């Protein structure tokens, strides 16, 4: 059984994430972000999930050192604050984009995102009644006030949404496919396809890791 270690950045959504992973058939172990990097690695995770949480990613305990230790070696999935940490680790600028909390918005898939297996069949602006139309809009739950407007080197944007800062990245992956991040909350009821997205993210990351020969 796939073992996911979830780093808890002290957010109220953490156990919703745990429930979603367990319901999808994954084993999940939770560590607070106050433990050591060594503690996380000693659990022998198949994948590490960096949870949502308050504040800036640089202030979130071990998160940044953990990313430095495992990037490209252990599959990483960042959610909200965890995604911002991945962006920051690649020298992306994480900055205020206007607070939006508890709102479902349609993010717009990029050209790469349209082709990405995580979002296949989830768009709301395409379907059998619209032949030939390429869908790009996927409804997701926003609970954040920080964002990144420009995708940093080493990462590829999969989706964006409009904010006070302009378009910010809502989903991205590293160019080696070993890390992926979602700015939105897939575990929220306001992300209708969220549980499916989570499962697909895990499966995609593990597949990529097997191709890279890290597992």
Language-model segments: residues:
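Histidine-centered divalent metal-coordination motifs
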Residues: 80, 144, 185
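Conserved hydrophobic/aromatic beta-strand scaffold that supports enzyme active sites
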Residues: 104-106, 169-171, 181
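Flexible gly/pro-rich beta->alpha loop and the following alpha-helix that scaffold active-site loops
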Residues: 3-7, 11-78, 90, 206
């Amino acid at each position: 059984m796939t073992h996911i270690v979830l780093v808890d950045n002290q957010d109220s959504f953490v156990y919703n994430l745990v429930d979603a992973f367990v319901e999808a058939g994954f084993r999940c172990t939770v560590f607070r972000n106050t433990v050591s990097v060594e503690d996380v690695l000693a659990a022998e995770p198949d994948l590490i999930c960096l949870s949502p949480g308050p504040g800036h990613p640089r202030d979130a305990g071990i998160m940044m050192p953990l990313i430095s230790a495992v990037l490209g070696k252990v599959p990483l999935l960042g959610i909200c604050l965890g995604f911002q940490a991945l962006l920051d680790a690649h020298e992306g600028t994480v900055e205020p984009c206007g607070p939006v909390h508890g709102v479902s918005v349609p993010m717009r898939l990029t050209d790469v995102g349209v082709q990405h297996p995580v979002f296949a069949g989830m768009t709301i602006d395409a379907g059998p009644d619209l032949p030939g139309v390429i869908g790009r809009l996927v409804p997701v739950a926003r609970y954040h006030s920080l964002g990144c407007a420009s995708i940093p080197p080493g990462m590829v944007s999969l989706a964006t949404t409009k904010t006070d800062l302009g378009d910010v990245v809502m989903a991205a992956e590293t160019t080696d496919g070993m890390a992926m991040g979602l700015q939105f909350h897939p575990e929220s009821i306001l992300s209708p396809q969220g549980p499916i997205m989570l499962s697909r993210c895990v499966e995609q990351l593990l597949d990529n890791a097997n191709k890279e020969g890290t597992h």
